[in-house]
Structure formats: C-alpha cells, structure tokens
Regions:
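HIT superfamily nucleotide-processing domains
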Residues: 1-102
Length: 102
C-alpha cells in the first residue's frame, strides 16, 4: 500500500525502533506510547484489519505476542499489560494496517 505508514516503516522508508523482526512480522516501539514499553506488532503483509487476516497468520502473530509480552514484562519488571487491537474507524483504528498494541 503506497500511503500506509506501517508499510513504509516495514520497508525501511521511515525509521523505527525495531525490537524484533522475522520474515513475517516486525515489532516496533510506538512513537507515541500510551505507557512505557508500548510496542506494536506489524504483519509485513498488508491487511487492513482483522477481517482480512487469515487464521494461520493470526495464530503465528498471537504466538509472537505472547513472546513479546513476556519480554516486556521481564525487561521492564511490570505486573500487567494490555493487548489492544482496533478494527475500523468507529472502533478507534487510526492506521488501516492490522497491528497489535502491547
């Protein structure tokens, strides 16, 4: 997607604080964090929202989310964290590229 900020981050056109990356996903620190350690898991393939993502990819993404959540918890010595995923403007989605907030 030409206008997608997350696609531009994934393609290296916009710098990011990457904390993990593999062939399928990129995990970055949020530029405007809601809290310390606020990270985003971005699929490298563009999906506008959860309604477009296939179950296999979603399964791998949530497996990664568990790993990232444990890393954030241990690194920052926190007791709890939220996982948030918005779909559609009415739900608060501001970037039309599926992503998971931790």
């Amino acid at each position: 997607m030409d206008n997608c900020i997350f696609c531009k981050i994934i393609n290296g056109e916009i710098p990011s604080a990457t904390i993990y990356e593999n062939d399928e996903f990129k995990v970055i620190l949020d530029r405007f964090p809601g809290n310390i350690g606020h990270a985003l898991i971005l699929p490298k393939k563009h999906y506008a929202n959860i309604f477009e993502i296939d179950e296999e990819t979603a399964g791998r993404l949530f497996k990664l989310a568990v790993m990232v959540a444990k890393h954030i918890k241990e690194t920052l010595n926190i007791e709890a964290l939220n996982i948030v995923q918005n779909n559609g403007e009415l739900a608060g989605q501001t970037v039309n590229h599926f992503h998971l907030h931790l």
